Amino acid sequence: MKKLLCAVLLSPLLYSNAVLADDAKQLRETLNGTESLKADFKQTVTDINKKVIQTGAGVFALAHPNQFYWHLTAPDESQIVADGKDLWIYNPFAEEVVIMDFAEAINASPIALLVHRDDATWSQYSVTKKQDCYEIKPKSTDAGITSVNVCFNNGTLNKFNVLDDKGNLSQFDLSNQHSISAADKSLFKFVLPENVDVDDQRLKTQ
């Protein structure tokens, strides 16, 4: 009787974990089917009271393995480039470039998770499917990002949003989606501008 009771009590938990695992697998399979993508985006940021505090626009691109490009062109320019090994963050206004190991890319830009195929990295997140969208949440309680939602239309990424721990919601709507061309591959090669300060935070190997 006790064994039966335990089985009844535990079965919802086991089912829930199985569903979450299936959702994560399905998301990764969908992402794996997108070898590359380039799109324009429009950004809207709202605060915890749903007041619009910023709007913007730019160009977004990704390619497997571990290549990522993010160029905010308005209102203030900024650029994030992952070349598969290193992550470059460029702030033209501050004339500064920060360089990180790609392993740290997700902390700087959680959307980089979309090109991450590393099992250990994905194991740090839970995934829940909601219709055509997937909610990705870090398991760490001290993460600066509360959740990332990615949405697809017929298998094509068409929007995503990022909720931070202060309640700010950044929403991105994509348009003009297409696979990257041979010429677009240069997007993932960051060219260091002249006369900028460089903050190299990469872990130095012995």
UniProtKB/Swiss-Prot annotation:
Q: Which organism is it from?
A: Shewanella sp. (strain MR-7)
Q: Does the keyword Chaperone apply?
A: yes
Concerning NCBIfam families, the annotation shows:
lolA (TIGR00547)
Subcellular location field: Periplasm
Where would you say this protein principally sits, based on its record? periplasm
The name this protein goes by in its record: Outer-membrane lipoprotein carrier protein
Highest rank taxon of the organism? Bacteria
Family the entry assigns: Belongs to the LolA family.
Assembly and oligomerization: Monomer.
Q: Which UniProt keywords apply?
A: Chaperone, Periplasm, Protein transport, Signal, Transport
Q: What does this protein do?
A: Participates in the translocation of lipoproteins from the inner membrane to the outer membrane. Only forms a complex with a lipoprotein if the residue after the N-terminal Cys is not an aspartate (The Asp acts as a targeting signal to indicate that the lipoprotein should stay in the inner membrane).
Query: Signal sequence span per UniProt?
Result: 1-21
* Record-level GO cellular component terms: outer membrane-bounded periplasmic space
Q: Which GO biological process annotations does it have?
A: lipoprotein localization to outer membrane; lipoprotein transport
HAMAP family in UniProt: LolA (MF_00240)
Gene3D superfamilies referenced in this protein's UniProt entry, alphabetically: Lipoprotein localisation LolA/LolB/LppX
Listed Pfam families: LolA
Q: What InterPro entries does the database record attribute to this sequence?
A: LolA/LolB/LppX, OM_lipoprot_carrier_LolA-like, OM_lipoprot_carrier_LolA_Pbac
